[in-house]
A protein has these predicted regions:
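Asp-based, Mg2+/Mn2+-dependent phosphohydrolase catalytic module
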Residues: 1-2, 86, 100, 104-146
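N-terminal helical cap/lid subdomain that shapes the substrate entry/recognition surface
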Residues: 2-76, 101-104
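Substrate-recognition element of Asp-dependent hydrolases with the DxDx(T/V) motif
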Residues: 60, 69, 81-108
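Short amphipathic alpha-helical segments and helix-helix/interface helices
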Residues: 78-83, 126
Length: 146
C-alpha cells in the first residue's frame, strides 16, 4: 500500500457530524433568538450564517467541543484499519461539507486525528494528497482496503 493516498468521507467513514451540526443550529437559534433557516447544504448554510450571525465559528467550536462526546465515539475497528494503513505508508485525508472546525473536533473525538494528514473539502484534500487519491465513502469500503 506504499504510495497510496486515501480521501475519506468524514461522515460516511469516521463520524456522522450531522446530528451535532443540527443540535448546534437549534442551540444557536435559541441563543440569538432568531429563527435560523439555513439550507441543508452546509456550504450554503455557512454563507447564510455569515450573513445572519457574523462570526459564528467560535460559537460552533465551543458547542461542538462540549457536545461532541454525546454523538461521536471512536470505532476501534475503523481506527485499527487507519493505523494499519498509515503504518504501511498510506497517506490519509478527510473531507466533509461540515465546517472545518466541526470536522476537526469530530476527528479528535473519533480518535482518528493522528492518522489524518489533511482535512478540508474533497477538492482541498485531493489537491493536498494528489489527484490520484482514492475516495472512500463508507467503513465497508475502508475495510476492503486492508
Amino acid at each position: 500500500m506504499t504510495g497510496l493516498a486515501l480521501a475519506l468521507d468524514l461522515d460516511g467513514v469516521l463520524a456522522d457530524t450531522r446530528p451535532l451540526w443540527d443540535a448546534w443550529l437549534e442551540d444557536a437559534s435559541r441563543r440569538v433568538r432568531v429563527g435560523l433557516e439555513v439550507p441543508a447544504d452546509r456550504e450554503a448554510a455557512a454563507a447564510a450564517l455569515d450573513e445572519a450571525l457574523g462570526d459564528w465559528r467560535p460559537l460552533l467550536t465551543r458547542f461542538a467541543a462540549d457536545r461532541a462526546p454525546l454523538w461521536i465515539r471512536p470505532r476501534p475497528d475503523t481506527n485499527a484499519a487507519l493505523r494499519g494503513l498509515v503504518a504501511a505508508g498510506t497517506r490519509i485525508g478527510v473531507f466533509s461539507d461540515a465546517p472545518r472546525e466541526l470536522a476537526e473536533i469530530a476527528l479528535a473525538h473519533a480518535g482518528a486525528a493522528r492518522q489524518v494528514e489533511v482535512v478540508g473539502t474533497l477538492a482541498e484534500v485531493r489537491a493536498a494528497l494528489g489527484g490520484e487519491a482514492v475516495v472512500v465513502r463508507s467503513r465497508e469500503e475502508l475495510a476492503g482496503l486492508r
